[in-house]
Amino acid sequence: MSKHSRRVFVVTLSFVMSLAGLARASDKYKIAGAEVVVVCPLTVGGSFEAKTKNVDGEIASGADQPGSIGGALRVDLQTLETGIEIRDHHMRDNYLEVQKGPDFAFATIEQLRVEKLDGKTTFKGILALHGQRKEISGTANLQPQNGKVRVDAQFPIKVSEFQIPKPTYLGVGVRDEIQVKVSLVAVPAASQIAGNQQ
């Protein structure tokens, strides 16, 4: 290879690597708004919902494995509300046991893997809850728009698998399998936006 060809190759390689770095960086997102809804079916029929909007985290497309998503989502279980104050206290203190520390006060979803990054898809991940870590799987709809990504996801969990005491309220129990719904909007990380403007 001639000196000129080597120079062209080095310049071209540097340019491609720079573009790749920007692409990876632009795939970093922070959570701009989110809501988690836990649907709890009752043993006697019907259900109630526990909700919170206290969700934060940062996610990014995994560079090492296609379909993987780095980062994590963290949900503040201390802010879950069902609409009945005494039931909220029972749920947080007697069952989720949020007073035991961060591993109980927060739930974390991490190591996400999706079939595709646009449209309806399936996903798997790890849920850290009540001091336990278990694999989860569910469905999601990802909608990129104007630089943002809206995500609506749903997955089931079994309360007993996380060693949570069997929930009862006024003699009525909650079924072992409950549904978790997550809706969020992710935007490019603020640090990355600032970096691009420099």
Residue ranges with predicted function:
Residues V10-A20:
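Bacterial N-terminal signal peptides
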Residues R24-Q198:
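Low-complexity, acidic/polar, glycine-enriched regions of mature
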Residues M1-T12:
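Bacterial N-terminal signal peptides that target proteins for export
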Residues K3-H4, S18, L22-S26:
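Extreme N-terminus of proteins, especially the signal/transit-peptide cleavage junction
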